[in-house]
């Protein structure tokens, strides 16, 4: 089920080397989110910094905020650890390290727990329907009401979200048929 070709060589190398979920997730998020030391507005107009953090030391990210690389590394580690802890607390089926990384990227890190808990993905996964859950990840491809599949090649498109969902699905379904 997992389409390895959708994942980067760096992520695949980590998985094949037996890397931990935090290592896999760090590489994946570096590729998907980037790491900005200066605050910027995300696609929804929310001020973010580092790998998409909206809060730093309990305070919201504001326009003009700048951080050092060391501070971003700290913020990124906190956010990564929170996402993986969420997976450990809320997913009731056994998971491999790549699966934990895929779920952490999708649910708590990207769409947020508030949207994840009522989702078909979450319900299917905890019911043991892994194939169905991996299919449901790929449904989350709208941004501001527009279908991101229709924006491929557009300057201000959101097609990267379609690719990210395919990759999160590949991680979440890593070796489920074996």
From Swiss-Prot:
It comes from the Viruses. Keywords: Antimicrobial, Bacteriolytic enzyme, Cytolysis, Glycosidase, Host cell inner membrane, Host cell lysis by virus, Host cell membrane, Host membrane, Hydrolase, Membrane, Signal-anchor, Transmembrane, Transmembrane helix, Viral release from host cell. It catalyses: Hydrolysis of (1->4)-beta-linkages between N-acetylmuramic acid and N-acetyl-D-glucosamine residues in a peptidoglycan and between N-acetyl-D-glucosamine residues in chitodextrins. The active site is at residues 33, 42. It is found in: Host cell inner membrane. The chain crosses the membrane at residues 1-22. It is a single-pass type II membrane protein. Its EC number is 3.2.1.17. InterPro entries: Bacteriophage_GH24, Endolysin_T4_type, Glyco_hydro_24, Lysozyme-like_dom_sf, Lysozyme_dom_sf, SAR_endolysin-like. Disulfide bonds: none annotated. GO terms for cellular component: host cell plasma membrane; membrane. One of its GO terms (biological process) is killing of cells of another organism. One of its GO terms (molecular function) is lysozyme activity. The signal-anchor, which may also be an uncleaved signal sequence tethers the SAR-endolysin to the membrane until the latter is depolarized by the holin, resulting in the escape of SAR-endolysin from the membrane. Signal-arrest-release (SAR) endolysin with lysozyme activity that degrades host peptidoglycans and participates with the pinholin and spanin proteins in the sequential events which lead to programmed host cell lysis releasing the mature viral particles. Once the pinholin has permeabilized the host cell membrane, the SAR-endolysin is released into the periplasm where it breaks down the peptidoglycan layer. Belongs to the glycosyl hydrolase 24 family. This is SAR-endolysin. It comes from Escherichia phage N15.
């Amino acid at each position: 089920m997992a389409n390895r070709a959708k994942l980067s060589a760096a992520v695949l190398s980590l998985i094949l080397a037996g890397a931990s979920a935090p290592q896999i997730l760090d590489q994946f998020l570096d590729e998907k989110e980037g790491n900005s030391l200066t605050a910027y507005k995300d696609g929804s107009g929310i001020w973010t910094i580092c790998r998409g953090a909206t809060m730093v030391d309990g305070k919201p990210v504001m326009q003009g905020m700048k951080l050092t690389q060391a501070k971003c590394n700290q913020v990124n580690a906190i956010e990564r650890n929170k996402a993986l802890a969420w997976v450990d607390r809320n997913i009731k089926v056994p998971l491999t390290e790549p699966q934990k990384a895929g779920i952490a990227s999708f649910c708590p890190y990207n769409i947020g727990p508030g949207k994840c808990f009522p989702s078909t993905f979450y319900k299917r996964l905890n019911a043991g329907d892994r194939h169905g859950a991996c299919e449901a990840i790929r449904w989350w491809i709208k941004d501001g009401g527009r279908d991101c599949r229709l924006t491929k090649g557009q300057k201000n498109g959101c097609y990267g979200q379609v690719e990210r969902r395919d990759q999160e699905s590949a991680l979440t379904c890593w070796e489920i048929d074996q």
